């Protein structure tokens, strides 16, 4: 049995396993549940509230499982609230094609923090930074190595009216001349 004893810090493998099993228990497939487990581990690793956010979201959808997003377009609106997990997996699976859109907008996405690790992993695959702009602030994701934000960790947003994803180009902060001068020193 996996449980947290007292104030003992939960190890990453346990976070991933419990997140995966809880997701499967509310109706996600094993494949999606595995992706959820990895994503919650990433959030916790970056000191973001993955467990508490997933717990709240799974309680919300327990009796009404969300629908999958069929296609991702430049602008994505739905009569229903969008599932951050299905949306995140769809982006992760198609990130090489989606980066050509440069900017993608989603409206009414549930628990937007849950999409962040999928985008962080996508950033690693395409080897480019991704900026995520929400109603309450911004995340900058850099190749699954850093997640920067100006959003308070205690801000547990349950829905984002608008979420914008921007695929950024890699840019050098130095000139060709500076590079050549440095290289000559070798």
Model-derived features: positions:
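N-terminal interaction modules that seed assembly of large macromolecular complexes
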Residues: 28-64
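A glycine-rich, acidic short-motif signal
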Residues: 51-147
